[in-house]
Amino acid sequence: MTTYVKQMQRIVDEYRLAGLPWPTSAKSIADWAITTGRWELPAAAIRRRCADDIASAMREEYMTDRKGRRVRLLHPAPLLTEGQTEMVWDDIRTASRSHMQISFQHRRKGIVGDCRQMKVDVDSYNDAHPEEKQIEIVFDFAMDLAELEAADEAA
């Protein structure tokens, strides 16, 4: 875990120890952290923040393909550049098959990671609350995808 992440977690801990409202929003904690001088944007973070905002905007750009499907236009792929892994973005209309395959594999890995973490969280919650009906999560998304595709075709 990075030092910066630990710093952010420490701010949350300090917020809670200060007896401020909980549960709360990240914005409320941010307002408190800025007001109390616990956080300010480091100069090195400005470039990273700008890049993150640009990446978020690129992730939200869509087009309609020839079959009428809403498709994400720009896709990142982790590529080795000058000895460092960097997310390189390309346009789905002009990107190489190799770029798209790497991008899709990377996205799938992220989805699997999210599912794994959800399973750990659900298992932990269930273990901590054995007296309650256990929460069950199905990780086979085939039916969900089929239903969404059927709804798209019906529209």
Segments (PLM) and residue ranges:
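Generic structural signal for short, flexible, solvent-exposed coil/loop and linker residues
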Residues: 12-13, 18, 39, 43, ...
